[in-house]
Regions:
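Entry/capping segment at the start of metal-dependent catalytic domains
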Residues: 1-3
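Short glycine/serine/threonine-biased micro-segments
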Residues: 6-8, 197
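Active-site-proximal helix-loop-helix substrate-binding element of RNase H-like nuclease domains
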Residues: 7, 13-174, 184, 188, ...
């Protein structure tokens, strides 16, 4: 995520209602041509760039909402989204994460990817990334996915994430896991983002001592 570019933003505010805002999509370069074009910020002036809203303009409009403390933002592995948006000086707070919710409620029972959870809990088979971006040697990065296909894929992701949240969040109290999520797992999300962004310094000697201590405890 430290190198990923923001290609677009998908949003959903109610089940079945979602949108996708393309920001940096590009058309596939001519066959045999080596495309060393820009990052999609030219607002449609490049012949290989479809017309779309300027990224800075879009983020300026979205920033107040994404940083509004009175509006809960829900994502699946939202740490990834947070890391990318932070590079554009946009924060996301407060947040809920459906991947973390699933892990807290059903750790070890199954995978916690969006596709698997959508099928398992909602009975819905998501569009696969390979269906829109291709597979093998024909796979392209998301910026080269045609806008109509990108819309279907990205908007569905936002829709399914919100639907999963409606299923998972109420279970915290029912399964007596609210304290674990609210006091341990959710507060850890911004901490991990900060650690991955800034890095951490470790004293090798102290780390070795801790490793030895933990090994002894496990042996007991």
């Amino acid at each position: 995520s430290m190198r990923a570019e923001l290609v677009g933003v998908s949003l959903s505010y109610d089940a079945g209602k979602a949108c996708y805002i393309p920001l940096a999509h590009r058309m596939v370069a001519p066959q045999g041509a080596l495309d060393l074009g820009g990052d999609g910020d030219d607002g449609g002036t490049d012949q290989n760039t479809p017309e779309q809203i300027d990224r800075d303009t879009a983020l300026a409009l979205l920033k107040p909402l994404l940083e509004d403390p009175s509006v809960l933002k829900v994502g699946h592995n939202i740490k990834y989204d947070t890391e990318i948006l932070a590079r554009y000086d946009v924060g996301i707070t407060p947040v809920d994460d459906t991947m973390v919710l699933s892990y807290v409620l059903e750790a070890g029972q199954h995978g916690h990817g969006l596709d698997e959870l959508s099928l398992r809990m909602l009975g819905h088979a998501n569009i696969k990334f390979g269906d829109v971006a291709g597979v093998g040697k024909k796979r392209v990065t998301f910026e080269y996915v045609p806008l109509d296909r990108a819309l279907d894929y990205a908007a569905e992701d936002a829709d399914m994430t919100l639907r999963l949240h409606d299923v998972l969040k109420p279970r915290l109290a029912r399964d007596h896991m609210a304290t674990v999520y609210e006091t341990l797992e959710r507060p850890l999300i911004p901490v991990l983002v900060a650690m991955e962004s800034a890095g951490i310094k470790v004293a090798p000697g102290h780390l070795k001592t801790l490793s030895t201590d933990f090994t002894k405890r496990l042996d007991k």
